[in-house]
């Protein structure tokens, strides 16, 4: 299935996964950008944003678990997020953490909060519609991860 066919499939888990990839880039960029703040609270939230981005890399790009040397404990933690509902919950929690960052004042971290919330909504819609989780082949869903090993 090509990328265009994946988007035409109307499976919300595909939309969630690609929104998650954008979240990875945004969380890493905003985490780094806001870490150079003079506000201690904002620095803490920027570190949390960076950690969220790093976790999302392994959740949304499954073949990285096979090629990166990680511990079995970390692998088991990441493998918990294989259903739409678990991913929706994870994204909602990450989004809530970034929304709380507003206590330190307005910052770019709100963009991460909004996009994480959108990804959570996509995964929740997939769960509500009882759609099976389908990983994008482009990101190592069905096929690429098996070819590597």
Swiss-Prot record:
Gene Ontology CC: Golgi membrane
Domain of life according to the entry: Eukaryota
Membrane topology: Multi-pass membrane protein
Residue ranges crossing the lipid bilayer per the database entry: 12-32, 39-59, 81-98, 104-124
UniProt-listed GO biological process terms: vesicle-mediated transport
Glycosylation sites: 11
Protein location: Golgi apparatus membrane
Keyword flag Iron: no
Coiled coil regions, renumbered to chain: none
Alphabetic keyword roster: Glycoprotein, Golgi apparatus, Membrane, Transmembrane, Transmembrane helix
Family the entry assigns: Belongs to the TVP18 family.
Role played: Golgi membrane protein involved in vesicular trafficking.
PANTHER family listed in its UniProt record: CALCIUM CHANNEL FLOWER HOMOLOG
Name of this protein: Golgi apparatus membrane protein tvp18
Species for this entry: Aspergillus terreus (strain NIH 2624 / FGSC A1156)
Organism phylogeny: Eukaryota, Fungi, Dikarya, Ascomycota, Pezizomycotina
